[in-house]
């Protein structure tokens, strides 16, 4: 976390030759290691899922406010989204911070399988480090700007619901990034490196099927199973896997499948993700899946509706900045 904070700082304003400045910043961040690690540990313990990161967001807001940042709460109509700003004028440098956890996982911070009792969510992707290290970098950039009398605007974007909620999409729609010159972003991993690869575009949504309930033993002929429709759709989508490009990723989970085996389910729901490096390919695969769902509904005499839950374009990397980041990672 310390290394990434320092590297983010170096990429924000400092020239690659300012070795003395980098060393001073490294020492400053290291001296505050206990403070920042405590913040990260608290967010780890909170383990709040997307759009519900109330305590995690508040903690980062408080940390940045105490460091002299102006806080704008609840941006884009999202209670846990915020922007922390320091300075004015150009350039406008954005630093992203995430802090949402994943549902259905509560692994303890140990190298073997060990769940945390009483918890149903956890930080499998290290977002407790993501938000904290980004905040640390922003704070140190601010201190450097004061010391060197540098002008410019520094913004920390508190971005909720990265895990499937596409929180940043709503922030982009509100124009919160319109005047930004560059955005710095990182993610915890098992090693420190700077990549020039992009990310997968994504579209996800829920397919809901409505049938007719009936007793499965006494009057099965009167029922129309919504679960049959879900299973029929899944079979067709699984057959489709042979006929999509190798980079395509399709994931699903049945979220509703009925209440009892002896009752024909009147309602069933399946949640799908589609990913691909190209947004247009995601769209094309999604349209084929919708046709499969329509066919499943027709064949089972049920009714189908689909709700798109979210979607994102593939990230466009900046090779020049990646090289700068890589050089600074080796430096620190």
Language model features by range: what are they?
Residues 1-21:
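Bacterial Sec-dependent N-terminal signal peptides
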Residues 19-123, 128, 132-153:
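Acidic/His- and Gly-rich active-site-bordering loop/insert found
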Residues 24, 28-31, 35-38, 55, ...:
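A non-catalytic, amphipathic alpha-helix used as a structural packing/dimerization or gating element
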Residues 29-33, 40, 44-47, 68, ...:
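Sec/Tat-exported extracytoplasmic proteins
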Residues 43, 84, 95, 127, ...:
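Divalent metal-coordination and catalytic microenvironments
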Residues 113-122, 128-129, 145-267:
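Histidine/acidic-residue-rich, glycine-tolerant segments that coordinate divalent metal ions
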Residues 231-332:
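Metal-dependent amide/peptide-bond hydrolase catalytic core
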């Amino acid at each position: 976390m310390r290394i990434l904070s320092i590297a983010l700082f170096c990429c924000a304003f400092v020239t690659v030759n300012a070795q003395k400045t980098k060393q001073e910043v490294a020492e400053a961040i290291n001296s505050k290691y206990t403070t920042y690690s405590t913040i990260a540990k608290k967010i780890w313990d909170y383990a709040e899922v997307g759009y519900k990161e109330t305590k995690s967001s508040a903690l980062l807001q408080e940390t940045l406010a105490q460091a002299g940042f102006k806080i704008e709460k609840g941006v884009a109509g999202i209670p846990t989204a915020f922007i922390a700003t320091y300075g004015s004028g150009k350039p406008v440098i954005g630093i992203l911070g995430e802090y949402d956890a994943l549902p259905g996982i509560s692994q303890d911070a140990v190298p073997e399988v060990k769940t945390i009792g009483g918890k149903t969510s956890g930080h499998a992707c290290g977002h407790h480090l993501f938000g904290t290290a980004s905040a640390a970098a922003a704070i140190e950039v601010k201190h450097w700007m004061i010391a060197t009398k540098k002008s410019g605007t520094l913004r920390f974007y508190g971005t909720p619901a990265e895990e499937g909620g596409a929180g940043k999409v709503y922030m982009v729609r509100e124009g919160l990034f319109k005047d930004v010159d560059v955005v710095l972003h990182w993610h915890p991993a098992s090693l420190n490196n700077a990549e020039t690869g992009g990310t997968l575009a994504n579209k996800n949504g829920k397919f809901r099927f409505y049938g007719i309930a009936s007793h499965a033993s006494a009057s099965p002929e009167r029922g129309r199973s919504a679960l049959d429709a879900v299973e029929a759709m899944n079979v067709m989508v699984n057959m489709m896997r042979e006929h999509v490009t190798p980079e395509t990723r399709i994931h699903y989970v049945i979220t509703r499948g009925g209440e009892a085996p002896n009752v024909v389910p009147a309602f069933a729901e399946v949640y799908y993700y589609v990913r691909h490096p190209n947004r247009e390919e995601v769209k094309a695969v999604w349209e084929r899946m919708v046709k499969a769902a329509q066919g499943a509904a027709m064949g089972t005499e049920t009714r189908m509706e689909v709700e798109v839950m979210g979607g994102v374009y593939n990230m466009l990397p900046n090779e020049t900045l990646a090289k700068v980041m890589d050089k600074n990672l080796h430096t620190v």
